[in-house]
């Protein structure tokens, strides 16, 4: 005997029902309400069919009858049908109301899910459109004619200068505050010595404030 492969996928079982009972299970377009107790008829018809089990049939039937397409067909004036497509009586109002409520609830859930997905995807889209700009480090403003700062001069090894020993372009140290500041002599007028400090600042000092 040839072994028949059992169907386990719900979509595959539905496709099998569409093919086996085309007047009852409608694959496309408007469906028709099914007879109450149709599952028992279905189980009996397929009792010798090894392709499907009762459990899988029940799952497939639930999928079919809970689809929006099926719930929309459960309306006033519609006739229930059996496995062969024969009419089995009109729907009761209770069943029509239940189908309408189930359809609305299912559609509301689907809408809420779409809204939630759109909200969660929106920040990512904005981030993708507007790349984050890296902060640009500002360069410190340089004073005109500024030069790299040199190590502070140790005053212990310096001695006060004599005016006669000084001359333009000579590197000297000027006593300003506690620490001497290095610079270059620009000009000498009488007792005033004009010095440009390494910081770029130009000052006039007396010879006694200059250290060598």
Curated annotation (Swiss-Prot):
User: Where is the segment annotated Disordered?
Assistant: 107-153
The subcellular localization recorded is: Cytoplasm
* Lineage top rank: taxon: Bacteria
Q: Which UniProt keywords apply?
A: Chaperone, Cytoplasm, RNA-binding
Compositionally biased spans, kind Basic residues: 127-141
Q: Kindly list the GO molecular function terms attached to this UniProt entry.
A: RNA strand annealing activity; RNA strand-exchange activity
Gene Ontology terms describing biological process: post-transcriptional regulation of gene expression
Q: Show the GO cellular component annotation of the record.
A: cytosol
- Biased amino acid composition, Low complexity: 117-126
A Pfam family recorded for this sequence: ProQ_C
Q: What is its main location?
A: cytoplasm
Record NCBIfam families = PRK04950.1
Protein family according to the UniProt entry: Belongs to the ProQ family.
**Record function comment:** RNA chaperone with significant RNA binding, RNA strand exchange and RNA duplexing activities.
Protein name from the UniProt record = RNA chaperone ProQ
**What organism, scientifically named, is this protein from?**
Shewanella halifaxensis (strain HAW-EB4)
Q: What is the lineage of its organism?
A: Bacteria, Pseudomonadati, Pseudomonadota, Gammaproteobacteria, Alteromonadales
Q: Which gene encodes it?
A: proQ
